[in-house]
Amino acid sequence: MSLKHPTIAVSAPGKVFLAGGYLVLDQEYTAFVFGLNARINIIAGDIHTTAGVQLTEIVVDSPQFLDAQWRYGYHLAGEGGGIKVTQLQVGAQINPNPFVETTLSYALTYIDRVAGHRPSHSLASARLIILADNDYYSHSESDTTRSGRFAKFPVTLSNANKTGLGSSAALVTSLTASLLVHYLPEDLFSIDSDKGKRTLHNLAQAAHCAAQGKVGSGFDVATAVYGSCRYRRFSPATLNKIPEPGVAGFADALVKLVDGESEWDVEVLKDAVTMPKGVVLRMCDVDCGSKTVGMVKKVLAWKSSNPEDSKTLWDELQSRNEQLIATLNAGDVAQLPEKINAVREKIREMGSASDVPIEPESQTELLDALSTVEGVHGGVVPGAGGYDALALLMKDDEETKQRVEVFLEKWAAEKGTKVKLLAVKGEMEGVRSESLDVYAGWV
C-alpha cells in the first residue's frame, strides 16, 4: 500500500512588491512584499491504468489555455543523479516548459531520497492540473470564456499577456507543494508546519532559480510560501553548489541544501507587515508588462559605478520604506499619503540617476491623478517598476472601488490607453491546502 495521498489540491499566492524594489537584491536591505488573493492552484492525483500496465509518467495539464499539456517520463539516474525528467512528445511538436520540468526534477528527487527507504514508497505516475486565477493575465471580456475563478483563454500559454503578479514563483511553489503533499506521508511533510514550510521554501527557491537560469533574490517564492512578509534575501552563493539533475551527486547536494538550516541566511518575518482595518491593497493593470531584466541590469550598473551616491540614496529609501510600513502597522491611515509620496520621490530620484524608467512619467501622471480620488490613499509602481500593474492603497468599500473604476474608464478613453482595476486584493496568507470542491468542473 502506498503512503501517498490519492487526490489533493494546494494553492500559492502571487505577490505585489509594495516597497523595496532593487534594494532587495542587496542583503543590507529588506523588502516589504504582500501576498495576493490571486492564486496558482494545483490538483495532484493518480493516473489510473488497466491491470498489469505500469507507467512512469507525469502528465501536466493547464486546461485554461490552448495546447497546454506536457507529458514527462522519469527515471532514477545513476551515481546519485536523482530523478531525471524527460519531456515526451505530445502532438506534432514539443513545447518546453522549463518551470514545470525543472520543478518536477527537483521535487521528485527530494521525495525519492527522503522517503525511498520506506518499503511502501513508490513514485507512481501522477496527473497534475494547473489552474490560475483570472487576474494573472490581461484579457478583455470578449477574449475569454468565464467559468467562475478560472477563465478559458483562446491563446497558448506562451502568448498569454501576464499582469506581473508573480506567476512563475507561485507556480513553482504550488507545484512543489502539491508533489510533496501527494507523495509524502504527513510525518515526513506537512504543509501547515513550520518545518514543512521551511522545506517547501528551500526546495522551491532552488527549483525556481534553476528554471530561471539565475539566482534571483527569492522574494517572490518566499511570499508564495509564507504570504505577506518583510524579506531579506539569502546569499546568492547558497545555490551555487548544486549540480544539474541527472549529474552525479545531485540528489545528495539537493537534500543537504533543502534540509540544512545553516545553509540559508534568509530572513522572512511574517509579523512585520499588517494591513489596517478598512484599508485594502488593490492592483491596476496597465496592460503592457515590463522587461525587468534590462532595467535591473542598468540600475545595478549605476550602483556599481556610483557606490557612495547610490548607498546614500538606498539608505534613505530603506528608511522611507520602513516608515511607510510602520504607518500601516500602526493603522495611522491619515499619514499614508505623505509616507507613500516620500517613497515615490526617492524611487523617481533613483530612476533619474540610473536613467531607468522605474516610475515613468505616464505612471507618475496616473498615480498622481488616482491619489486625488476620494478614498485612495496613494499608490506605487511596484517591484522593479516600469509600465506594469500599479499597486494602490485605498479604502476597502464598494463606493471607493466604483469611484476608481469610473475614473480609470474615463482616463483610458481620454489617453487612449488600456488601464483597469483588477479584482485581486492583498492577502496575508501563503501556501495552503484547498478543498477539491473549489475545482468542480475542472477535475
From Swiss-Prot:
Q: Which domain of life is it from?
A: Eukaryota
Q: Keywords on this record?
A: ATP-binding, Kinase, Lipid biosynthesis, Lipid metabolism, Nucleotide-binding, Steroid biosynthesis, Steroid metabolism, Sterol biosynthesis, Sterol metabolism, Transferase
Which biological pathway?
Answer: Isoprenoid biosynthesis; isopentenyl diphosphate biosynthesis via mevalonate pathway; isopentenyl diphosphate from (R)-mevalonate: step 2/3
Which GO MF terms does the UniProt record name?
Answer: ATP binding; phosphomevalonate kinase activity
UniProt catalytic activity: (R)-5-phosphomevalonate + ATP = (R)-5-diphosphomevalonate + ADP
Matches recorded under Gene3D superfamilies = 3.30.230.10, GHMP kinase, C-terminal domain
Annotated GO CC locations: peroxisome
Q: Where does ATP bind?
A: 160-170
Q: What class of enzyme is it?
A: transferase
Which GO BP terms apply?
A: ergosterol biosynthetic process; farnesyl diphosphate biosynthetic process, mevalonate pathway; isopentenyl diphosphate biosynthetic process, mevalonate pathway
Tell me which Pfam families the record gives: GHMP_kinases_N
| Regulation: induction | Expression is regulated by the Zn(2)-C6 fungal-type transcription factor FgSR which binds directly to the promoter.
As recorded in UniProt, its EC number(s) are: 2.7.4.2
Family membership, please give it.
Belongs to the GHMP kinase family. Mevalonate kinase subfamily.
As for what it does, the entry says: Phosphomevalonate kinase; part of the second module of ergosterol biosynthesis pathway that includes the middle steps of the pathway. ERG8 converts 5-phosphomevalonate to 5-diphosphomevalonate. The second module is carried out in the vacuole and involves the formation of farnesyl diphosphate, which is also an important intermediate in the biosynthesis of ubiquinone, dolichol, heme and prenylated proteins. Activity by the mevalonate kinase ERG12 (FG05912) first converts mevalonate into 5-phosphomevalonate.
- UniProt name for this protein: Phosphomevalonate kinase ERG8
